[in-house]
UniProtKB/Swiss-Prot annotation:
Stretches in topological domain Cytoplasmic: 270-316
SMART domains cross-referenced by the UniProt entry: IG (SM00409), IGc2 (SM00408), IGv (SM00406)
Domain Ig-like V-type: 29-139
Entry's Gene Ontology molecular function annotations: identical protein binding; signaling receptor binding
Pfam entry (one): V-set
Protein's UniProt name: CD276 antigen
Family classification: Belongs to the immunoglobulin superfamily. BTN/MOG family.
Lineage of source species: Eukaryota, Metazoa, Chordata, Craniata, Vertebrata
Length: 316
């Protein structure tokens, strides 16, 4: 039948063999798997459940069981008269041998990786053939967000501040939400980036830019869409009123006193200059008045002598 599948002696491809098998068998064997995706955390073990209903007198020698990736047809695990594994899953897959005879064809996948995510098909052949596919979703919870503030000191109302929310080692990509202190969503001035590391896990950095008020609380929520888990982080910022330290206050007082003294000195100098100028003008005016009176006194005798001469002439 399907003996030897997955081994080096296979002469035809698995897809061709399964196609021939589908044509030859009636499909009376019924394979059942979970309709809901199987969710597994990174680095934990996952069980992909698959079952069939064995007929009375069933023997494992009649069973051919194959697990493979649905899309690529890559072999994951097989059971014919033993097991054969694909290299990508070496030492990481196992069946439940003691339960096979009861119709339990489930696959145990150990130490789940991000790259294990996908659809897996369970093929069961006894005398008839059937198959079914089950989905595996891989997830990893995000760490509690760390909040950083830039600038982080000497903040005043009206300052533009940058708040960064960082969460690490999650999968799949996160959904990030910002809220203010009243629980209202903040969607403007938000920039979010997500980068996968070598294991495929994401580091999230979301940046919010806001104008600081008198005080405010800002919350960051990082949601894992598969696990429906939320990681919260928040920061409360208080904008301090403008104050001066004691040193600055003394410097300000000293400068003010110096400025007052300088203005007083300047006013005194100006007053002295103005006073001196006024005194000089007054002195000049007095000198001019004195010169005028002297001239008048000198002229008076001359007039008197002239009168005498005139008188003399008349007498003569």
């Amino acid at each position: 039948m399907l003996r030897g599948w997955g081994g080096p002696s296979v002469g035809v491809s698995m897809g061709t063999a399964l196609g021939v098998l589908c044509l030859c068998l009636t499909g009376a064997v019924e394979v059942q798997v979970s309709e809901d995706p199987v969710v597994a955390l990174v680095d934990t073990d996952a069980t992909l459940r698959c079952s069939f209903s064995p007929e009375p007198g069933f023997s494992l020698r009649q069973l051919n069981l194959i697990w493979q990736l649905t899309d690529t047809k890559q072999l994951v695990h097989s059971f014919t008269e033993g097991r054969d594994q694909g290299s990508a899953y070496a030492n990481r897959t196992a069946l439940f041998p003691d339960l096979l005879v009861q119709g339990n064809a489930s696959l145990r996948l150990q130490r789940v990786r991000v790259t294990d995510e996908g659809s897996y098909t369970c093929f069961v052949s006894i005398q008839d053939f059937d198959s079914a596919a089950v989905s595996l979703q891989v997830a990893a919870p995000y760490s509690k967000p760390s909040m950083t503030l830039e600038p982080n000191k000497d903040l005043r109302p009206g300052d533009m501040v940058t708040i960064t929310c960082s969460s690490y080692q999650g999968y799949p990509e996160a959904e990030v939400f910002w809220k203010d202190g009243q629980g209202l969503p903040l969607t403007g001035n938000v920039t979010t980036s997500q980068m996968a590391n070598e294991r495929g896990l994401f580091d999230v950095h979301s940046v919010l830019r806001v104008v600081l008020g008198a005080n405010g609380t800002y919350s960051c929520l990082v949601r894992n869409p598969v696990l429906q888990q939320d990681a919260h982080g928040s920061v409360t910022i208080t904008g301090q009123p403008m104050t001066f330290p004691p040193e600055a206050l003394w410097v300000t007082v000293g400068l003010s006193v110096c400025l007052v003294i300088l203005l007083v000195a300047l006013a005194f100098v100006c007053w002295r200059k103005i006073k001196q100028s006024c005194e000089e003008e007054n002195a000049g005016a007095e000198d001019q008045d004195g010169d005028g009176e002297g001239s008048k006194t000198a002229l008076r005798p001359l007039k008197h002598s002239e009168n005498k001469e005139d008188d003399g002439q008349e007498i003569a």
